[in-house]
Every structure is written in C-alpha cells, then in structure tokens.
C-alpha cells in the first residue's frame, strides 16, 4: 500500500525574527491529493518551540510525541532534546523504520533532525525539507541575501509560494508560525 507523503517545510532565523512555514497538501501515492489544509507546523513546549515535519503523517505524529516528551524531560533544552531524540530514533528498531524528518527551532537554535541520527544546525539560519525543500531553500537564501529588509515571516511565505509554484507535492495553503523576541 502506498503512503501519504510529500510536503515542504521552511524555517528561518532572520533580523531577530523566527518563522517556520509549511504547506497543507497531503498526497496519497503519486496521483491523488487527499487533503489541502493539513497542519504540519506546530508549537510545542509552552509555545516556545516550533516544529515542522515532512514525510509519513503517522510517523511524524509519533516523532512529535517523542520530541515533546524529550523537551519536557530536558526542560525545554532544544539541542539536548534533539540529540536525545536522534539517538533514540537511530537505535530503536521500530523508530528506525519511521519515514519522516523534523525541523525544530527556538529563539536560540534551528535544527534538522533525521532518522539516521543527524542533528544539523545550518550556517545561515535557514533550513528546508520535503519534496519542495530545495526550491524553498534556494528562494529563502536569495531573499535573505538580496532583500535583507524583509521579515522572517515574509521570507518564509515567499519561499513556500515559490516551492508551491514548482513542486507538484506542495500547495499554496501555507501555515506560518513565528517566535517573537
């Protein structure tokens, strides 16, 4: 049986602003759009952490639950919770089969967490994952570099709009969450 997949998640820390955006499309296989308004970006840990997922929906919900438990266990320490989740994800036989990736951020860090055990912090304060991730990443980097007066939210929305114009698995039903200083 084919799974539900494909999305684009984009996150940026820019000019003191922190934003994460995701589209709303859920695709079944390669031919059918099952939902247009899914919410793939969430607020966690007393609204101080943003998390977005790309991949299998059921797998992503499992990871959200595990990550939120790690945040509670480590009192909101994003980096420690991320490393501990990645270690568990990589070493657990059941979790290892999950097909999803997470981007998580707070006001101090922006991180990519993968099932192979990586926890990656970007050099430029921008991350993107999912089927339209490379398009969003390119657009976001260009905007950050050449239109530095834009807010983090404006760049996140524009990056998702660009990805949605190119990637058939990304739509224009964009959800944006922000953290403010």
Swiss-Prot record:
GO term, biological process aspect, one: proteolysis involved in protein catabolic process
Highest taxon of source: Bacteria
Taxonomic placement: Bacteria, Bacillati, Bacillota, Bacilli, Bacillales
A Pfam family it matches: Proteasome
SUPFAM superfamilies, alphabetized: N-terminal nucleophile aminohydrolases (Ntn hydrolases)
GO cellular component terms listed in the entry, alphabetical order: HslUV protease complex; proteasome core complex
Broad class of where this protein is predominantly found: cytoplasm
Subunit structure of this chain's protein: A double ring-shaped homohexamer of HslV is capped on each side by a ring-shaped HslU homohexamer. The assembly of the HslU/HslV complex is dependent on binding of ATP.
NCBIfam families: ATP_dep_HslV (TIGR03692), PRK05456.1 (NF003964)
Free-text activity regulation comment from the record: Allosterically activated by HslU binding.
Name under which the protein is recorded: ATP-dependent protease subunit HslV
The keyword Membrane is annotated on this UniProt entry: no
Keywords (A to Z) from UniProt: Allosteric enzyme, Cytoplasm, Hydrolase, Metal-binding, Protease, Sodium, Threonine protease
Keyword Protease: yes
PROSITE patterns attached to this UniProt entry: PROTEASOME_BETA_2
InterPro entries: ATP-dep_Prtase_HsIV_su, Ntn_hydrolases_N, Proteasome_sua/b, Proteasome_suB-type
Family named by the database record: Belongs to the peptidase T1B family. HslV subfamily.
Residues at which Na(+) binds: 164, 167, 170
Molecular function terms, GO-annotated: metal ion binding; threonine-type endopeptidase activity
